[in-house]
Amino acid sequence: YLLQLSLKYLKSESIFTDSHREHRYQELIQLAQDYLEVLQLQGYMVWEDVYAEIEDFPYKLAKNLCFEKLCIPRQYHPEYVRLLLKNMLEPCYGAGREKVRVYSFCNYLEFAMYVMEEAKGPRIFKREELADRLGISSYKLDQILQDVAMDAELVNVDFSYYLDATTSWKKPFVRLDTDTYFCLDGRMEGYAFYEVMFQIIYAKRGSVFSKHQGKLLEQMVYRMFREKHFPYITGEYRQDGDLPERDCDMILEGNERVMFVELKKCPLPGSYEQANDVDVLSALGAGMLYAQEQILWHKLRLKEKGVLALYDKEGNHIQDYTPGKKPVIAMSICMPEYDFLTDRMMTETFLESILRVTYHAIDPSQEKKLDKLNKRTENIRMVTARLFDGMKYTTRDVFYNSLFRSLQQVWTMLRVCDTLDVFLDMCATQLVMITGAGDVYVDIWNALQLKG
């Protein structure tokens, strides 16, 4: 909250002495801590999450949305941003006369990486420094700066209350004058390089570009696993009676367990930072829940047919797959960060609620936004009933072995795992480990420590 306010009133020079400035900073921080205490958004006991009732999920969701906006800046590793730029956007940028800007994509990538690596905390960049270090021609550099910088007076112009909309996430640079640019932090602002270039290409290529993003995402994830030499299976199976045709994005089979993985690009809505829980639930239905529904169809096909007969896009038979008696983990992956929503307890509570409740908006004008979510819950209940075929089951029987992760979280795990079995073990550990941190990166760290 204080960082966003500071960006709104950013000045090139301070009017205070160092000692006076430090004193005022401490006062501000204390006021912010007191404000957080008064709002009563923060829990201090891990058991609050463990024993949370499903009926309380909407309240828990709203409270966490507010806490996230107030306290937690979203961060992306520079190398992950590079991965997104190279794999998701460069193929659509064009070359020669077909490129969407006068500068090359290589120019843009070099610029972005330099800024992210240099801005380890608040950093002023001079145009002269960028020209000297990067060796980009003056005309091309000016266009890059025009694209990635927002004038200081336009940053967070309508932001006062902590749930007000911000604009700082749209551009990585704040333009203080024609030669001076400010970056808050390379990890906090790095994803804006992706946002900027996405909008540039979209303005030129339109819906053809955006529709191609899902396929590029799949190819990027497959490449990530191939580079680690982790084997995977992918394909699609055909309609068989009343069992529908489905894509099977990824199957990971280790010595002791199997994981079904489904990928979605689905971003959080812009109203997320304003704690619009209706829009967030709608996005969860379109992304995470849709992926879990697909995985339930995989399980049903295996139960009723005993095998997944997989084909490629050209209709060629790849293989007949069965996991045998190995336990199956389900993981849905979305490309952007989903903050606290990927926390184990949040995922479990939401998925369990799907089998017991429907979601409705207090505001009648917002109700239609939840239609697709509730339709998807109907589908999941139908598939679940058929999967258990008259047997008694609990909500945990259906979704206990389910994870929801951002792609950056999966990328982080891949960086520290030497074999596929180690990766699957780490995922299995996170299914049973509760830290109360609400942060998957803490869970990854703790899983590493448990392995010694």
Model-inferred region functions:
Residues 166-167, 243-245:
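Short solvent-exposed loop/turn micro-motifs enriched in small/polar/acidic residues
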Residues 252-260, 265-270:
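Active-site beta-strand-loop-beta-strand hairpin of nuclease catalytic cores
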Residues 249:
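Cell-envelope/extracellular polymer assembly enzymes that use nucleotide-activated donors
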Residues 1-215, 219-232, 268, 304-452:
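Acidic, metal-dependent phosphodiester-chemistry machinery of nucleic-acid enzymes
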Residues 244, 255, 324-325:
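A short, structural micro-pattern
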